[in-house]
Amino acid sequence: MSSEEKKNEQTSETMEPPKSVSGIIKHLGPGIIIAGSIVGSGELVATTLAGAQAGFILLWLIIIGCIIKVFVQVEFGRHTMIWSKTPMKALNDVPGPKVKNGANWILWFWLVMTCLVVVQQGGILGAIGEACTMVQPLTEQGDVYNKEMSTKINAIIKTAQDPSVAEVNKDALNLNPDKPKDIKLWAIGIALLSSALLFYGKFGLIQWVSTVLVFGFTVITIINLAMLQTKPEWAISFADLKRGLSFGLPESIGGVSSLHAAMAAFGIIGVGAAELIQYPYWCLEKGYSKFTGKRDDSSGWKSRAKGWIRILKIDAWTSMCVYTFSTIAFYLLGATVLGRIKLMPEQNNLVRTLGEMYVPVFGDWAQEIFVFGAFAVLYSTFFLAAAGMSRVVADGFGLFGFLKNDEENRMKWSRIISGIWPLMALGLFLFLNKAPSTMILWSGITQVMMLPILGVAALYFRYKCTDVEELQPTKAWDVFLWISVSGMFAIGFWTAYDKLFG
């Protein structure tokens, strides 16, 4: 084979980046998967409760929290594009303590975080089981449970609206039905289905599922907000939005300081630690790095790299728009539906409470629509996080020496682990028998504490690894990157302090 033939063979998979709108849209995808995995337990539960607690006044912070982490996300993607290196291998190159020929300090913290992410997945699976039981109980016990919980939550709502009826509703308020086996049966069925889909499915299927689910919960969210606008007592006014965008802080929330409330809200939204690591893997599978080609510092390679990094940025910012819209919507639902009557339901009853509040105004069909939207949100997180984490775990295990550390083996074990992951989550849900919100919280704490570490890595990638001048970001981008990292440090250290000494 001649040298020219070898060169052509090496570059046969490269592709010039698209410039037309249709071409760009065709090559988007990784960000939609990330959007689907983000808008789950955090946005549905924590953001809605934050809106209920603070009212409209923290809306500005919710928006900033969604936007600001994208700069770190893009730096992770940029590094992968330049060096064709997976994120875990890149993180293992960050200076610091390291086991000889093995994993460094970042990967050890990641290992702890990942163990708790599986627990979180178990909690989300339980929440999905509860949502399914609401609309389709499988046993008579489930039907009775739904009726008793409906009676109890309606009593809670009426008492919140008019405390004088508390005595009349005493019996209903004291109802405490045992959870039916329907929840576990639904969880088992969903875990088995997800395991099969993930094991046999490839990137195309995962992207398709994420697109359908993201589209589903986005449409449902629009419907929910539109219905609220038809009722004067629930409608969101211009004054409400103006207050939410005034950069103010609440005086106190149930005795909690405004700083505490603001930091808590900032920490639960936008791209989390797990998603920051997962994103470049989806970029690799979409082909961004392959289309760019192996680095040779030629003018052609630099041109392709610059163009595909542009596509990556568009993808990241598009996904940000999707999950920011959904996050804002859930925050407004909390501020409007719960905040105005000062009702703070238990996290495990949040979906049921919101669904019940729609019934007197819009009828039973409104509850079913809301619960379907909640299911789409929760299942997208469960399914897509399992798909993403399997790729990260396979790569990480190779660096720890548990698996052979090469690309072929990584891809093979990614598929195997993706099939096992939902079953592990199911086992933890059934074995631990904890409330879903408790299981979700455990993982959330470690992910927030991981953010400063990833901030350090992003700065290392930017200033030590982005050595091609044509591919370096602008000065303005660098400013926002530092702001992003500063925010991640603030929330990470605040969370550690709050949990240890708060």
Which stretches of residues belong to each language-model region?
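Transmembrane alpha-helical segments of multi-pass small-molecule transport proteins
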Residues: 137-199, 215-222, 411-427, 451-460
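Flexible loop linkers connecting adjacent transmembrane helices
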Residues: 8-13, 47-49, 74-102, 129-144, ...
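C-terminal membrane-solvent junction of multi-pass transporters and transport-like membrane proteins
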Residues: 203, 209-212, 395, 401, ...
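Juxtamembrane transmembrane-helix boundary signature
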Residues: 34, 61-96, 109-123, 384
